[in-house]
């Protein structure tokens, strides 16, 4: 059985390490911090949740479980040889087994994050005119989603059409993850 609260805590806490301005801000920080060990948003999240709040005598931070901290650190998978400084310091005291895969809850949080940001990026791209909806119809998940919306709601205003279609894309991605996970277990 999976711990839903753990998956949710990992999903929410890992985002604390993101800098302003999204991926552009992160890329800029990586470049600026390269001489000092670089920048990694998951390592930054660990730093924030383990050091920022200083209210208690026995510990700094949010007093999260080892499993939650491990999931935040391994949001993108095992860390490998190049360990960010923020993680290296914390890992000395609390071995997060960074060379192994994260828990199922952490993997669910990571997949959920991927699904969410990919759908938001798709919506942002459509709104900004980077993607034309007609061009996206050839994509395996997107085309059928729009076709279903057009059949069910033939006179839907464009904005609602987009939202309805992307809602179906989102649901299909979630369904694919669930079905693939079930078949792999």
Residue ranges and their predicted role:
Residues 1-36, 49-57, 82:
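Acidic/His-rich, divalent-metal-binding segments that scaffold phosphate/diphosphate chemistry
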